[in-house]
Amino acid sequence: MKKILCLILAVLLMLSLCSCTLEDLLNIRSPKDYTLLGDAKLVVHFIDVGQGDSTLLESNGEFVLIDAGERDCGNTVVDYIESRGCDELKYIIATHPDSDHVGGLKTVIETIDAENFITSETDKSTSTWLNVLHAVDEYDINYIDAEAGETYSFGEASFTVLAPLSDSYNNYNNYSVVVKAECDDISFLLTGDAEKESEDQMLASGEDLSADVLKCGHHGSSSSTSDAFLSAVHPAFAIISCGENNDYGHPHRETVAKLTNRGIAYYRTDTLGTIVAATDGKGISILSHGGTQVEAETISKEDLNNGASASEAAFPYVGNKSSKVYHRYTCSGVKTMNDKNKIYFDTKEQAVQKGYAPCSLCNP
C-alpha cells in the first residue's frame, strides 16, 4: 500500500512541477511549497536544524537522509521529510555519532520507514548514539558498515562513499562518512564533520574529489576545508550548515575567506534557513527558504567548465540592506560587507525596483 501511495504522490508531484516557474520557487513560504523545477532529477535539501546537520536527497521518488540534527530537531526533520511526500527512506546515513548530527535520528526511525542504515564503526557509546543503534535494530533496518568505494543508487542518482579511510582516529569527526552524490554531469560532496586528517587521506587515495557543490566540513570550521582539499574539489557552490550566533563562531573567518577569495558562492543556513539545490543533471539552481531569499538562476555545467565564477554568474549584483546601495559582485565594498546585510540580484533592474541605488565606486 505504501508503495502505491508513493507512486500516486510521485505522479501528482510531477504534474505540479510542469507549471512551476522560477518566480514561484522564490516566493515559497513552507517546505511543502518546494515544488521544484519540472526537469529536476536530483534535489538536495540542506535542512535548517540550527547548530547541526541534516541533508535530504531526493530523486525520482526515492530518498536518502544524511543526519538529523540534535534530539530536539527530530520532529522538524520528520515534518520536512513528510512534506516532500516521503513515507520511506531508502538510506539513512549517520555520518558520525556526535549528537548535533544523530540526535534526531531516533525520532526519524520511529516515525518513517527506512530500508538501510549506513554509518562508520566507532567506540562511542553515548546514550544518544546507543538509542539510535537500538532503534535501527528494533525496526529491523539493514545495517551497513560504511566502506570507501561502495556506490549506492537511488532514483536517477547515486552516491559513493569516499571516507572514512581508517578505523582509528583520535577525533570522532574524522570518522565522518563522506559521500559524493552524482546525477549525470552534476555532483555534490557531503563531508559531515570530516577534518583535515580525513581530507588528507581522501587526497592521498587518488579518488576524484571534484564536485560542483561542497557542503563544507564541520559547519565551516577552520579545522576543515583545507586549501589542498578545496583545490581538489574545486566547487562552484558551497553550503555551510550552522546555527545563528552559535557558541563556536561557525563559520570561521578563515573558511569564509577561502571561499570568497576563490569566487565560490556560499550559502549559510544560519542566514538563509533551509537551502535547496536542484539539478537536471546539466545545471544547478540554488534556492533558499527562510528570512532571506536568494535570487536564484540556473547555472549550466558548460558555463562552470568555461571558468565562470558561480558567484558572479548567478548573482552579478549585491545590495547592502543597511545602506540600500547595490554593487557589482567584484566590488571591494562587497568583500567587507556583513553576510547578514547582503541581498543578491541578477539584474540592475531588480535592484532599482527594490529601492537600491548604484555604488559610486564600482558604478554597476
Predicted regions and their residues:
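Hydrophobic core
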Residues: 9, 13-17
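Generic alpha-helical secondary-structure signal
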Residues: 7, 111, 354-355
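Non-globular, low-confidence helical/coil segments that flank catalytic cores
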Residues: 2-4, 17-313, 335, 360
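Mature, structured domains enriched in cysteine- and short glycine motifs
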Residues: 289-290, 295-364
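Residue-level detector of short, conserved catalytic/binding motifs and their immediate flanks
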Residues: 11, 177, 324
